[in-house]
Amino acid sequence: MTESFTRRERLRLRRDFLLIFKEGESLQNEYFVVLFRKNGLDYSRLGIVVKRKFGKATRRNKLKRWVREIFRRNKGVIPKGFDIVVIPRKKLSEEFERVDFWTIREKLLNLLKRIEG
């Protein structure tokens, strides 16, 4: 299994995001809300939504890079065949400077592993 994050594994179209927001199921913990929906493909696709309230662009971009990296490096444990949207919660925004990558990885992977159709 390749560890790249290819173009086909990204959610890019507005209609894909809207469909997940409208028809998707959700899981959440103190740091993230994960919305997901079956996509009928043999691989999962990832989208990330970070509000401006999260902080300046550098903070938002850093979080998005971390989430993409977690997805990319852990494809083997994430269920296949889902469109997934990750949304950070306010608590993560407040604690972001004090939380390290490994804590965020653990919290996000716990949610992603619980995805089921």
UniProtKB/Swiss-Prot annotation:
EC code: 3.1.26.5
GO biological process: tRNA 5'-leader removal
GO molecular function: 3'-tRNA processing endoribonuclease activity; ribonuclease P activity; tRNA binding
Keyword entries, A-Z: Endonuclease, Hydrolase, Nuclease, RNA-binding, tRNA processing
Similarity field: Belongs to the RnpA family.
Assembly notes: Consists of a catalytic RNA component (M1 or rnpB) and a protein subunit.
Name of protein: Ribonuclease P protein component
Record lineage: Bacteria, Thermotogati, Thermotogota, Thermotogae, Thermotogales
